[in-house]
Amino acid sequence: MTKKKAHKPGSATIALNKRARHEYFIEDEYEAGLALQGWEVKSLRAGKANIGDSYVILKDGEAFLFGANFTPMAVASTHYVCDPTRTRKLLLNQRELDTLYGRINREGYTVVALSLYWKNAWCKVKIGVAKGKKQHDKRTDLKDREWALDKARIMKHAGR
C-alpha cells in the first residue's frame, strides 16, 4: 500500500474574484491550466496575484486570460523584463473551447476568472460563463444573504 502525502499547511487557493459572483450570474464553470513563465510561478507561490478585473478573451481558437495582475518578486531576474499584466494563455480542451465560443456568441454572456489555485503542482484557474446582473438582482441577493444569516442567528439562540 502506498502512503498518503502529508497535506501542506495553508490553503491551495491563491486568489479569489469575489466581485464576479456579485456582478454576474455564473452559469457554467470550467477548470483551465495557465501557460506561465518562471517568475510568475514564483509570484504565485508567494501569493502575489490579483484577478479582480480579469476576464477571458477568445481569439484564433485559443483562450487568453486578460487583466490578471501577477506582481513580480523583488528578487526576480535582472536581465528579464517582467510584465505583470501580460495576457496569459489558458489551456483548455478543444471541446471546451468550442462550448465557450458558442456561449459567448450569445448576447450578454462573458467569461470571467473566478479563482486561481494550486492543484498538485499545477496552477489552475476556474473560469465561469456569466451573464451580468441588474441592480435589482444584486439587491435581492443581498437580502437573501442577510436573511440566511439572521435565520442562522435565530436558530442558534432558539436552541438555548
Curated annotation (Swiss-Prot):
GO terms for cellular component: cytosol. It is found in: Cytoplasm. Its main location: cytoplasm. InterPro entries: SmpB, SsrA-bd_prot, SsrA-bd_prot_CS. The keyword Cytoplasm applies. Transmembrane segments: none annotated. It holds the Pfam family SmpB. SUPFAM superfamilies: Small protein B (SmpB) (SSF74982). Required for rescue of stalled ribosomes mediated by trans-translation. Binds to transfer-messenger RNA (tmRNA), required for stable association of tmRNA with ribosomes. tmRNA and SmpB together mimic tRNA shape, replacing the anticodon stem-loop with SmpB. tmRNA is encoded by the ssrA gene; the 2 termini fold to resemble tRNA(Ala) and it encodes a 'tag peptide', a short internal open reading frame. During trans-translation Ala-aminoacylated tmRNA acts like a tRNA, entering the A-site of stalled ribosomes, displacing the stalled mRNA. Belongs to the SmpB family. This is SsrA-binding protein. It comes from Klebsiella pneumoniae subsp. pneumoniae (strain ATCC 700721 / MGH 78578).
